[in-house]
């Protein structure tokens, strides 16, 4: 048997951009049975949340997954609004994140599900998502207080250009 302590992941950085505020995790009071669903954007997060919801709620149809399993690090609504709503939940919590593990507070008692998807496939879904997003999404991300960094604009029409920019900025 090993005498070495487990080296749990540690948060070593914060991520603030037009979508994310990783500091929301700093103030979360974890419960022992919390489930954290982590993926890069457009990699099956909502699908995984729906599967977990079906397991936790015995197949109950029409669950409001976005409400009962919030994206904790999304800037909108701000963490001052979101954290009390999460704390008030009485069901087993399952929370969404798009943060890399080094920007996420890790709780050894929580359960983690990570989904990966080939980046060459992801970039097509992201481009499609933003190319077809309505003005309300862009207004919420760009005009809500707390924006860090540049405003987000619509993607270029040329998917190859978008892919190269996505690679250049390491997907963020």
Please annotate each region the language model reported.
Residues 1-172:
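PAPS-dependent sulfotransferase catalytic domain
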């Amino acid at each position: 048997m090993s005498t070495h302590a487990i080296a749990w992941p540690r948060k070593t950085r914060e991520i603030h951009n037009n979508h994310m505020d990783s500091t929301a995790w700093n103030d979360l009071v974890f419960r022992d049975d919390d489930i954290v669903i982590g993926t890069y954007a457009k990699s099956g997060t909502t699908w995984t949340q729906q599967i977990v919801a079906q397991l936790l709620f015995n197949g109950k149809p029409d669950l409001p997954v976005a409400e009962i399993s919030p994206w904790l690090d999304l800037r909108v609504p701000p963490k001052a609004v979101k954290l009390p709503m999460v704390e008030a939940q009485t069901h087993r919590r399952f929370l969404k994140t798009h943060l890399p593990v080094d920007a996420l507070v890790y709780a050894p008692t929580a359960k983690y599900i990570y989904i990966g998807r080939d980046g060459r496939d992801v970039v097509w879904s992201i481009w499609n998502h933003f190319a077809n997003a309505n003005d309300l999404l862009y207004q919420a991300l760009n005009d809500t207080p707390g924006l860090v960094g540049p405003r987000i604009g619509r993607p270029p029409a040329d998917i190859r250009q978008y892919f190269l920019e996505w690679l250049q900025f390491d997907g963020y």
